[in-house]
Amino acid sequence: MQKKQYWNVKTLVFMALLIAMHLVLTRVLVIDLGAYRISVGSVCTILAGLWLGPVAGGVCGLCADIIGCFMKGYAVNPFITVAAILWGVLPALAKPLFANRKKTGKTVGICVSIVVTAILSSLIFTTAGLVIMLGYNLYAIMPGRLVQFAIMSPISGELTCLLYFSPLTAMVVGNVAPAVLKKKTV
């Protein structure tokens, strides 16, 4: 019988930190051009998935998107919310494919998972959300979204690999014994 696993305090703190970084990078330090948003906030969600697992990555993407909508005064767009969740889930699900490889294999695996996620998330779900929910013309915004994809995918891949192969990864997923909350009976 398998034991139930719960998130510990360390995991929740890192999730909150990555959500906060995502919010700053996507809502404050951003170039917002209507249907196009140039930001690197998705790197935080990708790292949450790679470091803490696909569920934590998806939760970070969900929370960051919903809180970000409240910060900017937008209504929550379900297509864009699914896209934000995918940024945390898909690279984490691809991690077993490259986890046991050398650094070059891991780098290629991370970059391929980011490109696949960007195609599904940015080009399909986010574009669908802009067209269906906000009324943008698909043929008018698709060329710009392809350019955005071509520019942001390598930048996201480079930043993710830079942070993933840093000492920060050892600190987040290291063998440090995390604090455990135990229920006390009175």
Please provide the spans of the model-predicted regions.
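Loop-helix junctions at membrane interfaces
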Residues: 1-186
